[in-house]
Each structure stands twice: as C-alpha cells, then as structure tokens.
Design a protein with these regions (language model features):
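Short, well-ordered beta-strand segments in beta-rich or mixed alpha/beta enzyme
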Residues: 2-8, 35-66
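Glycine-rich beta-strand-turn "strand-cap" elements at beta-sheet edges
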Residues: 2, 35-46, 74-98
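Short amphipathic alpha-helical segment that frequently serves as the phosphate-/nucleotide-binding helix
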Residues: 19-23
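Non-catalytic surface loops within mature trypsin-like serine protease
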Residues: 10-12, 54-56, 90-93
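Intrinsically disordered, low-complexity acidic/polar segments
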Residues: 15-17, 47, 59-61, 95-98
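Short, surface-exposed ligand-recognition loops at beta-strand->loop->(often short) alpha-helix junctions
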Residues: 7-18
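An amphipathic, aromatic/His-enriched active-site/gating alpha helix that lines ligand/cofactor pockets
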Residues: 24-35, 53-87
Length: 98
C-alpha cells in the first residue's frame, strides 16, 4: 500500500465545509483508494492532518496526476490558508483492531 500524510491549515470557520469537501473524495470512487482520515488537532483546531491510503504507488500517482484530482485539490485549497505540506510514502505496517 502507498499513501500520503499532509499537514493542512484550515481557514477560520470552515470545519464543516472541509469535512464536506473530504466526503466528495469518497463519493468520487477513486480507483485504488482505500481510506482517508482527517485529524483536527486538539491544541490548534485550524491545524489538520490528512492521511490517505491507496492500494499501491501506481494507483496513488494515477489519481494525483488526473485532471479530476486537480479539480478536487483546487476546491480544497480554497478552504486552506495555503498549500498542504505533503509526505508521500510506502505503508510498511498496518494493524486493524476487531
């Protein structure tokens, strides 16, 4: 599996819009997408971390380089103070409870 972790800084008051925008990714049924998680930090509610999981590196980059993803990304940027800080990489361990 492959994915990214991104640090994002949301504009004030856009929490609900950010959650709705992330739901649009789920509704898009992106080929190879496994899961997405958004964390809102306790000590700074405007700071969010996004974790995205794909089946493999090829699926991740096929999505990242698609015009559809570019359009989704541009909509997401409207809710952020600036571009996310991306950290792409191979997922080397997974544990699921239950």
């Amino acid at each position: 599996m492959y994915g990214t972790v991104a640090r994002m800084r949301a504009k004030p008051g856009v929490g609900a819009q950010l959650a709705e925008e992330m739901r649009s990714y789920e509704e898009a049924h992106i080929e190879g997408a496994v899961a997405s998680y958004v964390y809102q930090m306790d000590n700074d509610p405007s700071e969010c971390w996004l974790a995205v999981v794909f089946t493999n590196k090829e699926a991740y980059f096929a999505n990242a380089n698609s015009p559809e993803q570019d359009a989704r990304y541009r909509k997401l940027l409207e809710l952020l103070e600036g571009p996310p800080e991306w950290h792409d990489g191979e997922i080397v361990y997974v544990a699921q409870q239950g």
